Regions:
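His/Asp/Glu-rich metal-coordinating catalytic cores
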Residues: 1-124
Length: 124
Protein backbone atom coordinates (compact mmCIF):
# COMPACT_ATOMS: atom_id res chain seq x y z
CA UNK A 1 0.00 0.00 0.00
CA UNK A 2 1.02 3.60 -0.31
CA UNK A 3 1.48 6.17 -3.01
CA UNK A 4 2.87 5.32 -6.40
CA UNK A 5 3.13 6.98 -9.80
CA UNK A 6 2.36 5.22 -13.08
CA UNK A 7 3.50 6.42 -16.50
CA UNK A 8 3.15 4.84 -19.92
CA UNK A 9 5.72 4.42 -22.69
CA UNK A 10 4.49 3.84 -26.25
CA UNK A 11 6.11 0.77 -27.81
CA UNK A 12 5.88 -0.57 -31.35
CA UNK A 13 4.12 -3.89 -31.79
CA UNK A 14 1.73 -5.58 -34.19
CA UNK A 15 -1.08 -4.82 -31.75
CA UNK A 16 -2.10 -1.14 -31.97
CA UNK A 17 -1.70 1.17 -29.00
CA UNK A 18 0.81 -1.02 -27.15
CA UNK A 19 2.49 0.50 -24.11
CA UNK A 20 5.10 -0.29 -21.52
CA UNK A 21 4.43 0.79 -17.96
CA UNK A 22 6.72 2.50 -15.45
CA UNK A 23 5.67 2.31 -11.80
CA UNK A 24 7.50 4.50 -9.27
CA UNK A 25 7.02 3.53 -5.63
CA UNK A 26 8.78 4.56 -2.42
CA UNK A 27 10.60 1.20 -2.66
CA UNK A 28 11.87 1.74 -6.21
CA UNK A 29 11.04 1.77 -9.89
CA UNK A 30 9.52 -1.12 -11.85
CA UNK A 31 9.28 -1.08 -15.65
CA UNK A 32 7.41 -3.62 -17.74
CA UNK A 33 7.76 -3.26 -21.49
CA UNK A 34 5.08 -5.66 -22.67
CA UNK A 35 5.99 -7.38 -25.94
CA UNK A 36 7.64 -4.89 -28.28
CA UNK A 37 9.75 -4.51 -31.41
CA UNK A 38 12.07 -1.57 -31.99
CA UNK A 39 10.86 -0.38 -35.40
CA UNK A 40 12.32 2.93 -36.57
CA UNK A 41 9.89 3.15 -39.51
CA UNK A 42 6.67 1.64 -38.16
CA UNK A 43 3.34 1.64 -39.96
CA UNK A 44 1.74 3.24 -36.88
CA UNK A 45 3.02 5.58 -34.15
CA UNK A 46 6.72 5.46 -33.24
CA UNK A 47 8.08 3.91 -30.05
CA UNK A 48 8.98 6.45 -27.38
CA UNK A 49 12.64 5.40 -27.36
CA UNK A 50 13.81 8.67 -25.80
CA UNK A 51 11.31 8.31 -22.95
CA UNK A 52 12.41 4.70 -22.37
CA UNK A 53 16.06 5.83 -22.42
CA UNK A 54 15.40 8.66 -19.93
CA UNK A 55 13.71 6.23 -17.54
CA UNK A 56 16.71 3.91 -17.86
CA UNK A 57 19.21 6.69 -17.17
CA UNK A 58 17.22 7.73 -14.09
CA UNK A 59 17.46 4.13 -12.85
CA UNK A 60 15.28 1.03 -12.86
CA UNK A 61 15.16 -1.42 -9.97
CA UNK A 62 13.21 -4.14 -11.79
CA UNK A 63 12.81 -4.51 -15.56
CA UNK A 64 10.29 -6.99 -16.94
CA UNK A 65 10.97 -7.07 -20.69
CA UNK A 66 9.35 -9.22 -23.36
CA UNK A 67 10.36 -9.22 -26.99
CA UNK A 68 9.78 -12.24 -29.22
CA UNK A 69 13.03 -13.60 -30.72
CA UNK A 70 15.17 -11.22 -28.62
CA UNK A 71 17.68 -14.03 -28.14
CA UNK A 72 18.36 -14.24 -31.89
CA UNK A 73 21.18 -12.27 -33.51
CA UNK A 74 20.29 -9.42 -35.84
CA UNK A 75 17.03 -7.53 -36.04
CA UNK A 76 13.55 -7.90 -37.44
CA UNK A 77 12.83 -5.83 -40.54
CA UNK A 78 10.58 -2.82 -40.19
CA UNK A 79 6.88 -3.37 -40.82
CA UNK A 80 7.27 -0.77 -43.59
CA UNK A 81 9.70 -3.11 -45.40
CA UNK A 82 7.32 -6.02 -44.98
CA UNK A 83 4.48 -3.96 -46.49
CA UNK A 84 6.69 -2.99 -49.45
CA UNK A 85 7.45 -6.68 -50.04
CA UNK A 86 3.76 -7.61 -49.84
CA UNK A 87 2.93 -4.85 -52.32
CA UNK A 88 5.55 -6.25 -54.70
CA UNK A 89 4.05 -9.76 -54.40
CA UNK A 90 0.59 -8.36 -55.21
CA UNK A 91 1.99 -6.51 -58.24
CA UNK A 92 3.66 -9.64 -59.64
CA UNK A 93 0.80 -12.05 -58.98
CA UNK A 94 -1.10 -13.26 -62.02
CA UNK A 95 -3.70 -15.28 -60.17
CA UNK A 96 -5.17 -15.92 -56.77
CA UNK A 97 -3.17 -15.10 -53.63
CA UNK A 98 -3.70 -16.80 -50.30
CA UNK A 99 -2.37 -14.80 -47.38
CA UNK A 100 -1.84 -15.86 -43.78
CA UNK A 101 -1.00 -13.63 -40.83
CA UNK A 102 -1.39 -13.50 -37.07
CA UNK A 103 -4.93 -12.42 -36.23
CA UNK A 104 -3.46 -10.00 -33.69
CA UNK A 105 -1.36 -8.23 -36.34
CA UNK A 106 -3.96 -5.53 -36.92
CA UNK A 107 -1.59 -3.20 -38.81
CA UNK A 108 -0.72 -5.98 -41.29
CA UNK A 109 -4.41 -6.77 -41.87
CA UNK A 110 -5.05 -3.05 -42.39
CA UNK A 111 -2.17 -2.74 -44.86
CA UNK A 112 -3.43 -5.76 -46.82
CA UNK A 113 -6.85 -4.12 -47.03
CA UNK A 114 -5.31 -0.85 -48.28
CA UNK A 115 -3.28 -2.68 -50.94
CA UNK A 116 -6.34 -4.66 -52.04
CA UNK A 117 -8.47 -1.51 -52.34
CA UNK A 118 -5.79 0.27 -54.37
CA UNK A 119 -5.61 -2.69 -56.78
CA UNK A 120 -9.39 -2.77 -57.15
CA UNK A 121 -9.40 0.95 -57.96
CA UNK A 122 -6.71 0.40 -60.62
CA UNK A 123 -8.94 -2.16 -62.35
CA UNK A 124 -11.86 0.28 -62.68
Amino acid sequence: AGEFKVSFIRVTHSIPDSFGICVDTKEGRIVTTGDFKIDLTPVGPEMEIHKMSKIGVEGVDLLLADSTNAEKDGWTPSEKNVVDSINEIFDKASGRLIISTFSSNISRIQQLSIIEKSLLLEEV
